[in-house]
Amino acid sequence: MLLERLSTHLAVVFAMLTSLTANADGGTLESQLRSAAENGQAAQVRSLLDQGAKLEARDKMGRTPLLLATHNNQVEAARVLIDAGADVNAKDSIEDSPYLYAGARGHNDILKLTLAHGADLSSTNRYGGTALIPAAERGHVETVRLLIAAGVAVDHVNKLHWTALLEAIILGDGGQRHVDIVRELIKAEADVNLADGDGITPLQHARQRGYKEIQVLLERAGARA
């Protein structure tokens, strides 16, 4: 009986020491994985996965290791995670996913990886927008091209009643990047007369802001005021 109790006691002590050692070494395998992913330590990410770290282990904000890697545009770490089967559509508490975030931020290398591994083109962010809409707003020309080529709906309307075309005009600066984006959207057959929630058309918005080049593009495409 005494030996049994001693054995049980030693087992408990061993478990506590193991836990303390893990914390001293940087926490659980999962917390180490998230940190390695966020900091672009691709070899460490691979090692932790080999040790059994859970691929989709989330932090308090619901962010997976892949989303954390995407936040910092850590391409190689993201590649290791995606090759291991990480979910490119897993959303956090504010409805960002690796695919949506890469598109919104113009992280094109990671975006290409997500597109090649099952990105849900119809998924939307907390504003009800596809990846194309914030990409258009922020002037990410190549990202817009990638998303159009992938098949994202160009006339999707978000919760603000804006399309990618409207957002490129309303929140853009009228400079060359946004001119190029408007051109790409028109080439993709975006509806140039699809108005916002107040009935204001893309052409009217362009005129109000004095965006001459965008006005010309819209008018040539058949836009009405």
State where each predicted segment sits.
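Ankyrin repeat structural motif
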Residues: 41-49, 74-82, 107-115, 140-148, ...
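Leucine-rich solenoid repeat scaffolds
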Residues: 193-225
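N-terminal, post-signal-peptide region of Sec/Tat-exported proteins
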Residues: 47-77
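Ankyrin repeat A-helix N-terminal signature
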Residues: 35-40, 68-74, 101-107, 134-140, ...
